[in-house]
A protein has these predicted regions:
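Primarily recognizes the serine-hydrolase "nucleophile elbow" in alpha/beta-hydrolase
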Residues: 53-115
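Serine-hydrolase catalytic machinery in alpha/beta-hydrolase-like enzymes
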Residues: 1-65, 161
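C-terminal catalytic histidine-bearing segment of alpha/beta-hydrolase fold enzymes
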Residues: 141-199
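Short beta-to-alpha linker loops that shape the active-site pocket of alpha/beta-hydrolase fold enzymes
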Residues: 20-24, 104, 155
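Acidic catalytic loop of the alpha/beta-hydrolase fold
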Residues: 125-130, 157
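Short beta-strand/loop motif that positions the catalytic acidic residue
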Residues: 114, 120-122
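Short alpha-helix in the alpha/beta-hydrolase fold that links the catalytic acid
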Residues: 3-4, 130-140
Length: 199
């Protein structure tokens, strides 16, 4: 994920990558102290949503105090982090845009609290997620939210990490510029609109 943060920074964004596993690892360690992904997932599961949102809010607040900050902030995440991006769009005042890569949309009560544009990506070879992202579109429209999404054919979960499977590399080449353009649209200029679209 550090490589992704670096790619965002190269686009001119201030990027903070909070370690939501800080203090949860062996001997109080962080993300890097977990040897196995399953152990990391279990540890993260012990942290409540309010705790995670608090860590994300603290990272955002820190970023906004940096000299180059323009007063706007966005959030992106991948898998569980993609779900946190959805949650943050609802729970953190002052977030201006959210991009979710293969993250689960929230429940309707949380969705109703979303105040910012959301962009979501998924692959149709991710049967536990793709239908949920597609189902979020009419709900977001009904709620008057600005929502864009793209579900890629023959693409798996975590497609940015698994480039050799199916059409994952194609999805990566398409989704990344879309995410950058989305952030530039909502973080660099005053924009007020409500729409739901896929293309």
């Amino acid at each position: 994920m550090r490589a992704v943060a670096d790619k965002l920074a190269l686009q001119g964004f201030i990027v903070i990558m909070p370690d939501l596993a800080s203090g949860l690892g062996p001997n109080g360690g962080n993300f890097d102290s977990f040897k196995y992904p399953d152990d990391l997932a279990k540890a993260l599961g012990t942290r409540t949503v309010p705790e995670k949102i608090g860590l994300l809010r603290a990272a955002r607040d820190y970023a906004l105090k940096l000299p180059r900050a323009n007063g706007k902030s966005g959030i992106t995440g991948f898998c569980n982090g993609g779900g946190f991006a959805w949650e943050s769009a609802a729970e953190i005042p002052g977030i201006n845009a959210a991009v979710s890569f293969y993250g689960a949309p929230p429940n309707l009560a949380t969705m109703a609290k979303i105040r910012v544009p959301v962009l979501a990506f998924a692959g149709d070879d991710d049967p536990g997620l793709a239908p949920k992202v597609a189902a979020a579109a009419p709900e977001m429209q009904r709620l008057g939210k600005t929502f864009e999404f793209k579900i890629y054919p023959n693409v798996t979960h975590a497609f940015l990490e698994h480039q050799t499977l199916g059409e994952n590399a194609v999805a990566t080449l398409d989704s990344w510029p879309r995410a950058i353009a989305f952030f530039k649209r909502y973080l660099n200029a005053q924009t007020s609109s409500t729409n739901t679209r896929t293309n």
